[in-house]
């Protein structure tokens, strides 16, 4: 994977940061996107290769297009896109008490952000007849978590998008997949109510959270050249929770 170019959204922390570190260790050139890049600037020494850092709001379609145009011009290609930016929104709230504003805010980041990046990366990949796109879904998108309507529905939409795009570009050399983790311990989950986190963890047969390293290891395989005959698929990383 040396000399490949990867865009990673939500790269300043959590899943995105772990994935970026692992890809960097494999010699991948990184274009890291986040709305708050101060943490990336502070931790730039963690990467084996010097990343290009872009401050961008992925809910802003114009800004996303401009950023991807800059990345394509700077590197001359884009081989990998990992959409790891995501928010949970307000949780531990039943559907009748969930605000419309919360639903829209979560969908804007989790679904529309992933749609915008893939929309503008795919035309860069097509002439090269190669690309790896990975949308970060969630087990909540497959099974639904009570009290998390916005998050669960947005991740279900992300999984559906991977299925559609996988079929649409199956003959182009571009693969589009998703991954559906159960609880991976990150700062995002530290902000959840204890009851909500326990509800999620209790459903995992291994009775533990996944680790960022476990996630990064699987992601690096999914976006590698070795993973060449799987597209439109949602990979499981749930400690045995997934039933399909």
Q: What does each model-found stretch correspond to?
A:
Residues 92, 143, 220, 231-244:
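Short C-terminal tail/terminal secondary-structure segment
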Residues 92-95, 99-107, 189, 200:
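Substrate-binding pocket helix/loop in short-chain dehydrogenase/reductase
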Residues 123, 167-171:
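Alpha-helical segment proximal to the catalytic Tyr-Lys
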Residues 170, 175, 230-232:
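Short, small/polar-rich loop/turn modules that mediate ligand/substrate recognition or access, typified
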Residues 2-30:
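Canonical Rossmann dinucleotide-binding motif of NAD(H)/NADP(H)-dependent dehydrogenases/reductases
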Residues 138:
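Residue(s) in the substrate-gating loop at a strand-loop-helix junction
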Residues 118, 154, 162:
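Active-site helix of classical SDR
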């Amino acid at each position: 994977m040396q000399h490949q170019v990867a865009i990673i959204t939500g790269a300043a922390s959590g899943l995105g940061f772990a994935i970026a570190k692992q890809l960097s260790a494999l010699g991948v050139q990184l274009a890291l996107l986040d709305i708050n890049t101060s943490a990336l600037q502070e931790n730039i020494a963690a990467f084996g290769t010097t990343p290009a850092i872009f401050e961008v709001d992925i809910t802003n379609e114009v800004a996303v297009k401009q950023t991807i145009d800059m990345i394509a011009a700077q590197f001359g290609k884009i081989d990998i896109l990992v959409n790891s930016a995501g928010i949970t929104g307000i949780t531990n709230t039943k559907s009748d008490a969930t605000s419309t504003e919360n639903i829209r805010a979560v969908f804007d980041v989790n679904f529309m952000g992933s749609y915008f990046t893939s929309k503008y990366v795919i035309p860069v990949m097509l002439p090269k007849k190669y690309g790896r796109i990975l949308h970060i879904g969630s087990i909540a998108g497959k099974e639904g978590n009570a009290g998390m309507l916005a998050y669960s529905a947005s991740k279900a939409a992300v999984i559906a998008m991977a299925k559609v795009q996988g079929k649409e570009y199956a003959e182009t050399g571009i693969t589009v997949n998703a991954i559906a983790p159960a609880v991976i311990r990150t700062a995002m989950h530290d902000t959840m109510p204890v009851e909500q986190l326990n509800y999620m963890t209790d459903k995992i047969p291994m009775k533990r959270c996944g680790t960022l390293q476990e996630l990064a290891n699987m992601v690096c395989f999914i976006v590698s050249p070795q993973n060449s005959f799987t597209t439109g698929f949602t990979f499981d990383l749930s400690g045995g929770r997934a039933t399909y």
